[in-house]
């Protein structure tokens, strides 16, 4: 009986550790190539539990906000409202935290996804 309780407690503790969100709070920078040129980005993230918030600054579209942000372990997702050819669009991001780098996949509209890496900025 005690062995079963101990095993259950261990499994519960391991589950809590695995679900812990990576702390990516702070400034991150990166760039990706588009058909019209290089787009430089600055992301300022805040993490509260599993909720991801913050701001973005694009050399192409200007400032925006992080919306619908979630982070679970090393996996994250969020959306960014933007404009394309004068029309409002929603850019969707998914990503994987890799220490001081995050691999992001960015999609919007009928365009193929952009994959790029951002780096923590000190």
Language-model features: locations:
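Bacterial N-terminal signal peptides that target proteins for export
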Residues: 1-9
């Amino acid at each position: 009986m005690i062995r079963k309780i101990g095993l259950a407690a261990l499994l519960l503790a391991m589950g809590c550790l695995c679900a812990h969100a990576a702390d990516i709070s702070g400034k991150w920078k990166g760039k990706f190539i588009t058909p019209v040129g290089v787009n430089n980005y600055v992301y300022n993230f805040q993490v509260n539990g599993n909720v991801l918030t913050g701001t973005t600054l694009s050399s192409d579209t200007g400032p925006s906000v992080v919306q619908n942000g979630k982070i679970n372990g090393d996996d994250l997702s969020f959306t960014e409202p933007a404009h394309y050819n004068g029309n409002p669009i929603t850019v969707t991001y998914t990503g994987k935290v890799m220490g001081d780098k995050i691999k992001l996949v960015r999609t919007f509209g009928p365009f193929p996804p952009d994959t790029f890496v951002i780096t923590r900025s000190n």
